[in-house]
UniProtKB/Swiss-Prot annotation:
GO terms for molecular function: pseudouridine synthase activity; RNA binding; tRNA pseudouridine(55) synthase activity. It is an enzyme of class 5 (isomerase). This is tRNA pseudouridine synthase B. The keyword Phosphoprotein does not apply. It comes from Xanthomonas campestris pv. campestris (strain ATCC 33913 / DSM 3586 / NCPPB 528 / LMG 568 / P 25). The gene is truB. GO terms for biological process: mRNA pseudouridine synthesis; tRNA modification; tRNA pseudouridine synthesis. It catalyses: uridine(55) in tRNA = pseudouridine(55) in tRNA. SUPFAM superfamilies: Pseudouridine synthase (SSF55120), PUA domain-like (SSF88697). Pfam families: TruB-C_2, TruB_C_2, TruB_N.
Length: 308
């Protein structure tokens, strides 16, 4: 019989290198058990096929998980031309095979160009987007006819890193909500041969541009060695580095923590991260054009290290 896990309050961000074949939620729960963290959340799903950076938020850090969900991201994608699948990736069932035309690098660059910028993109039918309160993938698995939603997404850059027919590799930098599977599918149609994702790796998520990731295997080994894996957590403040920052003295910080609005013409307008004078994160706020700071999310029980 397995010993019962005693969970504990733990605050911080773990930069997990998600393995292929595991859902984002299963990866989160595995890490949460290893850390013995009471509360955890992830910052946006990676497809089971995908590997790479999955920031996991624990404790008070879960209050900024939604902000990281909306951050810019970068992916390395391997695309196979000539075959379409029902999931738009290699995990799905083949639907159609077509011959791949002779393609020069210039032709590929020209085909990729319309996918850069703000574009309309139809989500895969096998996706976690909900329709009528139910994920699309659940409907697709039952064989229902689905019209996946078309949404505006932003692709900042696409770099063709290699091409050896029928495989090409891309580095894609994009905004929140972009499906690389959809990009591969649509590129295949532009080229007239169809395509699907063979491999996908997320390499960074703002603000973690050069992440030092840890695998579940390494995390397990660390725990089994008797070490406290909490040392791997980044402080909550690490997830706030892209925000304008306001530092308050003890009196004003106490008022802010009680939900009171503060006013100072010197406050930068927009969403801000608010810190105590000792460097501990107090919360997130919104400053209007008149310098009024309104609390949005308040952090509780964090010291200057903010990950303990």
């Amino acid at each position: 019989m397995r010993p019962r896990i005693t969970f504990r309050p733990l605050h911080g961000i773990l930069l997990l290198d998600k393995p292929a074949g595991l859902s984002s939620n299963n990866a989160l729960q595995a890490a949460r058990r290893l850390l013995r963290a009471e509360k955890g959340g992830h910052t946006g799903s990676l497809d089971p096929l995908a590997t790479g950076l999955l920031p996991l938020c624990f404790g008070e850090a879960t209050k900024i998980a939604g902000l990281l969900l909306g951050s810019a991201k970068a992916y390395d994608a391997e695309i196979v031309l000539g075959v379409t699948t029902d999931t738009d990736d290699a995990d799905g069932q083949p639907l159609r095979e077509r011959s791949v035309p002779a393609l020069s690098e210039a032709a590929l660059q020209a085909a990729l160009a319309p996918f850069i910028g703000r574009i309309q993109q139809q989500a895969p039918i096998y996706s976690a987007l909900k329709q009528g309160g139910e994920p699309l993938y659940a409907k697709a698995r039952r064989g229902e006819v689905i019209e996946a939603p078309v949404r505006e997404v932003e692709v900042h850059a696409i770099t063709l890193t290699s091409y050896a027919s029928p495989r090409l590799r891309l580095r894609v930098t994009c905004g929140s909500g972009t499906y690389i599977r959809s990009l591969a599918r649509d590129l295949g149609e532009v080229l007239g041969c169809g395509a699907h994702i063979a491999a996908l790796r997320r390499v960074w998520v703002e603000p973690f541009r050069t992440p030092e990731m840890i695998t579940l295997e390494a995390l397990t080994a660390l725990v089994e060695s008797g070490a406290d894996a909490a040392q791997l957590l980044l402080p909550v403040a690490a997830g706030l580095s892209d925000f304008a920052q306001i530092t308050l003295d003890a009196t004003l910080a106490a008022r802010f923590r009680m939900g009171q609005r503060l006013r100072d013409p010197a406050f930068p307008e927009g969403q801000v991260a608010v810190f105590d004078a000792d460097g501990s994160p107090a919360g997130l706020g919104l400053v209007d054009a008149d310098g009024r700071l309104s609390p949005q999310r308040l952090f509780n029980g964090l010291n200057a290290a903010a990950a303990c």
